[in-house]
């Protein structure tokens, strides 16, 4: 389309009609207008200074790097060369795998390649030379190998790195993949899933994906640059996809005759509806997928919400696909304490070692005390706590656990604002370092803010879940 016609299409319909009446040719009705935004700007000095990334959220972007066009990168996350966790992180990941395995659930880990690995060709030469791509790729592949040795099914996504494709894998100014990136990832993941025992027994049907519209992305990296530099970047538009069963479009039956899906997807906002990752998985696997991921869920949000659901407790999947990025630390003890508790539904249906209920008032509230009816043996290494608020919208638990020797643990659990909560917080008592033999004395909970309604809550202590394992494993760095 020539420049004259582009100008014509950008005019008001009245002006365009008048010009057309004067003999100016119209563009073909089937041909959509094209738009091109010039690159916005260069980063200001403030964006290069890590001290300016002050909040916890801002620190996820430390520090921005200008690349070609409107591309931005983050030095700590996108251009990382290390992919690893602590010995405690490996131990917990192994325990989690074994617990799922004991319940007949096979876990597939989708460990995203970084934007630096995939799109280093967008960097300016000076930054590209500083980024050790070979080291990053080697360490990324080594991490995939460590997941695999722990027993996880791990798609090798390294063929996606350093790619030269017509459609961007990642957005220029955002950490999320585009629908095209999700599509290319899903194709590789599906090939791994097909090798998982039990996949052959899962009901199959054909799916097809098609472009269903356009999405505009105001990038998180672009937004951060705007906060630091006062700049404003153009919205990046991208095709959006919908996946439907072949021959069943619009029938209103999400899962057709296949019943409840036996494959579930948990993960970050990358697995959200906008990018159609679950849809592409269905297309390439030929099987239904229950997608429980939601925006803002992070590493654990959708996993915890799913584990506590009736869907999981009554109908656990044969295959659970867990998608996350190297951004997240894998040694966050509080996350595993919750997962291991919820895997067998916390204290639900189990005898209570100690229990109580009360109405919380503002400030500190004593809820459980070991000794009111005789001292009980409540060692951390063999017990868990299940707390339920009547108000299901409660998303934050602040508690202090006291022990017989005067020691205490301050515990704060925050659920994502975007999650569908049930007011429940179940977790194992702490057992890392030297905590396993601590004897629980009391549980205190912070009540609601002053001026708000009192909150009813109940708490139960019970024996923690015991998951059978074929052998005792010690997972550590360098597996």
PLM features: residue spans?
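N-terminal secretory signal peptides that target proteins for export/translocation
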Residues: 1-7
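Extracellular glycan-modifying ectodomains
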Residues: 2, 26-479
């Amino acid at each position: 389309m020539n420049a004259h016609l582009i100008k014509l299409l950008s005019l008001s319909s009245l002006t365009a009609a008048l010009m057309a009446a004067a003999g100016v040719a119209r563009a073909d009705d089937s041909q959509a207008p094209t738009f091109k935004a010039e690159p916005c700007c260069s980063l200001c000095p403030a964006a290069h200074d890590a001290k300016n990334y002050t909040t916890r959220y801002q620190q996820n972007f430390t520090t921005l790097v200008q690349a070609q066009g409107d591309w931005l990168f983050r030095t700590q996350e996108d251009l990382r060369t290390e992919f690893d966790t602590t010995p405690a992180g490996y131990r917990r990941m192994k325990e989690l795998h074994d617990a799922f395995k004991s319940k007949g659930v096979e876990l597939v880990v989708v460990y995203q390649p970084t934007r630096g690995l995939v799109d280093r060709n967008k960097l300016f030469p000076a930054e590209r030379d500083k980024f050790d791509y070979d080291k990053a790729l080697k360490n990324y592949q080594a991490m995939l190998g460590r997941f695999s040795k722990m027993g996880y099914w791990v798609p090798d996504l390294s063929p996606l790195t350093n790619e030269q494709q017509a459609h961007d894998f990642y957005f220029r100014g955002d950490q999320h993949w585009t629908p095209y990136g999700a599509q290319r990832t899903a194709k590789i993941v599906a090939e791994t899933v097909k090798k998982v025992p039990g996949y052959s027994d899962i009901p199959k049907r054909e799916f097809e994906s098609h472009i269903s519209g356009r999405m505009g992305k105001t990038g998180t990296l672009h937004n951060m640059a705007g906060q630091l530099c006062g700049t404003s970047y153009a919205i990046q538009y991208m095709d959006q996809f919908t996946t439907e069963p072949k021959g069943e479009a619009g029938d209103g039956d999400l899962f057709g005759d296949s019943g409840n899906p036996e494959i579930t997807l948990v993960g970050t906002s990358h697995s959200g509806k906008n990018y159609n990752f679950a849809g592409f998985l269905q297309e390439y696997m030929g099987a239904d997928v229950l997608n429980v991921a939601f925006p803002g869920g992070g590493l654990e949000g959708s996993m915890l919400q799913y584990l506590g659901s009736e869907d999981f407790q009554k109908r656990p999947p044969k295959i659970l696909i867990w998608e996350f990025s190297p951004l997240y630390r894998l040694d966050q003890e509080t996350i595993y304490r919750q997962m291991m508790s919820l895997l067998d539904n916390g204290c639900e249906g189990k005898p209570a070692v100690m229990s109580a209920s009360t109405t919380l008032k503002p400030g500190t509230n004593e809820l459980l005390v070991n000794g009111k009816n005789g001292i009980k043996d409540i060692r951390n290494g063999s017990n868990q706590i299940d707390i339920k608020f009547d108000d299901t919208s409660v998303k934050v638990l602040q508690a202090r656990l006291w022990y017989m020797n005067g020691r205490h643990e301050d515990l704060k659990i925050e659920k994502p604002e975007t999650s569908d909560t049930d007011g429940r917080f179940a977790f194992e008592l702490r057992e890392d370092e030297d905590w396993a033999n601590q004897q629980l004395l009391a549980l205190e909970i912070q009540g609601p803010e002053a001026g708000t309604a009192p909150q009813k809550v109940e708490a139960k202590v019970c024996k923690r879940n015991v998951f059978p394992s074929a052998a005792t494993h010690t997972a550590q760095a360098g597996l």
